[in-house]
């Protein structure tokens, strides 16, 4: 705490003494400014004692500690902006917090961020981390009729997909409304985040509830097949037109970006700017210049989100997302700059898998396609665009979701699949 200046008020020093994690000099100074900013606001409203009580007792039964909501919902400290509840939860509880997606308000919080009131609660003990739900094992009967070979997957890559815009046209198949920020909310680095007018389908919806085993299966030997979280939650391949470029990126971090810059890639960034291609044409070159900050991918609580950080839209083809909204499986959704879309949900997939087991080997194998997500930068494809297939777009990526794919492999093996490996490339 050596960086604290001599005139730092005692209350600020005490509150900083409770912060979590180790920070470097610059970060420590920023934390001090964030606490000073909050102390100044709370002095005016007489809530300072309640803040100190909440931080020192770590008690969820303390009162809401509120500050006025700004127009865009963010709080500026020095030259950085962020959502206030995320800033103070990170400072006093979870230094590894990446995003507001990872937080859920406690029931007794009257001014929770998602309530969209004029005041927002920043009591760190009025929020909890979103936990990844435990997926129930799939009960799999061993079939006696084994297919001689894998059935052909429904392949939409060469068909002309329908198009939809985000958030227009997003009508869920149930009345479940998730806790999401209102339109216009911005993420911490200055991009509009989670305009999610895309309520996800309730896991209890009739369309997604796992069916009980049919009577024909009652006397069969049922084996539970469990979901295991892999070390790398997804693998990302980059393409220019129909040619794959560079090595596959394996994502291990819950939040990572794919961008157009030339920095060396690391566990949290896949930088496309450094990748070379002798066959690259002028259209691809031009598109690459507009990728910019690209897309941020989150894997939190068993859900995958894509947030467009670029100044140009991204275009996403996610069969899981399309099923949620009742669209054709090949529909391509345009995500404008700053918007955020849930592109995969493990619980929905688990329910579909449990249903498909009752329908036989082929129905389960068809779910392989659902574990692949395609995403193009700047230029879209589909019926409303000049480019009608993803391989006609200058720059695009393909995500393989490793956890669901490996789960499918295990289920198919238990069902008595052929000895060859079933995967997204089988």
Curated annotation (Swiss-Prot):
Residue intervals of the MH1 domain: 10-136
MF (Gene Ontology): cis-regulatory region sequence-specific DNA binding; DNA-binding transcription factor activity; DNA-binding transcription factor activity, RNA polymerase II-specific; I-SMAD binding; metal ion binding; RNA polymerase II cis-regulatory region sequence-specific DNA binding
Pfam families associated with the record: MH1, MH2
Please report the PTM annotation for this entry. Answer: Phosphorylated on serine by TGF-beta and activin type 1 receptor kinases.
PANTHER family per record: MOTHERS AGAINST DECAPENTAPLEGIC HOMOLOG 3, SMAD
Q: What is known of its domains?
A: The MH2 domain is sufficient to carry protein nuclear export.
Q: Under which name does UniProt file this protein? A: Mothers against decapentaplegic homolog 3
Q: What is the lineage of its organism?
A: Eukaryota, Metazoa, Chordata, Craniata, Vertebrata
Quote the gene name from the UniProt entry: SMAD3
């Amino acid at each position: 705490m050596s960086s604290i200046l001599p005139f730092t008020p005692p209350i600020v020093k005490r509150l900083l003494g409770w912060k979590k994690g180790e920070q470097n000099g610059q970060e420590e100074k920023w934390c001090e400014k964030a606490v000073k900013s909050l102390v100044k606001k709370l002095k005016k409203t007489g809530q300072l004692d309640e803040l100190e009580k909440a931080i020192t007792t770590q008690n969820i039964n303390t009162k809401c500690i509120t500050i006025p909501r700004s127009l865009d919902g963010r709080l500026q400290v020095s030259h950085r902006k962020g959502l206030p509840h995320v800033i103070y939860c990170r400072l006093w509880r979870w230094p590894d917090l990446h995003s507001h997606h990872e937080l859920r308000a406690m029931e007794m919080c009257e001014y929770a961020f998602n309530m969209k009131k004029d005041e927002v609660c920043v009591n760190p003990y009025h929020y909890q981390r979103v936990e990844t739900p435990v997926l129930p094992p799939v009960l799999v009967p061993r079939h006696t009729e084994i297919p001689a070979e894998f059935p052909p997957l429904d392949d939409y890559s060469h068909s002309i997909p329908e198009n939809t815009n985000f958030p227009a046209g997003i009508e869920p198949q149930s009345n479940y409304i998730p806790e999401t920020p209102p339109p216009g909310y911005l993420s911490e680095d200055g991009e509009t985040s989670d305009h999610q007018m895309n309520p996800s389908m309730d896991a209890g919806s009739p369309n997604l509830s796992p069916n009980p085993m049919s009577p024909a299966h009652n006397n069969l030997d049922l084996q539970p097949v469990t979901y295991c979280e892999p070390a790398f939650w997804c693998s990302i391949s980059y393409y220019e037109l129909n040619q794959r470029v560079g090595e596959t990126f394996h994502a291990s971090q819950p939040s990572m970006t794919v961008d157009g810059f030339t920095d060396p890639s690391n566990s949290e960034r896949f930088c496309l700017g450094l990748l070379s291609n002798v066959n690259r044409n002028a259209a691809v070159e031009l598109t690459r210049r507009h990728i910019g900050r690209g897309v941020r991918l989150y894997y939190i609580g068993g859900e995958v989100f894509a947030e467009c950080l670029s100044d140009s839209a991204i275009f996403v083809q996610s069969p899981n997302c399309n099923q949620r909204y009742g669209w054709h499986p090949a529909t391509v959704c345009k995500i404008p700059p700053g918007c955020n879309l849930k592109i995969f949900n493990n619980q929905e997939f688990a329910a579909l898998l449990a249903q498909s087991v009752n329908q036989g080997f082929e129905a389960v194998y068809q779910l392989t396609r659902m574990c692949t997500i395609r995403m193009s930068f700047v230029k879209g494809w589909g019926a409303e665009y000049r480019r009608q297939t993803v391989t006609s777009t200058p720059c695009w990526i393909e995500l393989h979701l490793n956890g669901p794919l490996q789960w499918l492999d295990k289920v198919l093996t238990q069902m008595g699949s052929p000895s060859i490996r079933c995967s997204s490339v089988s």
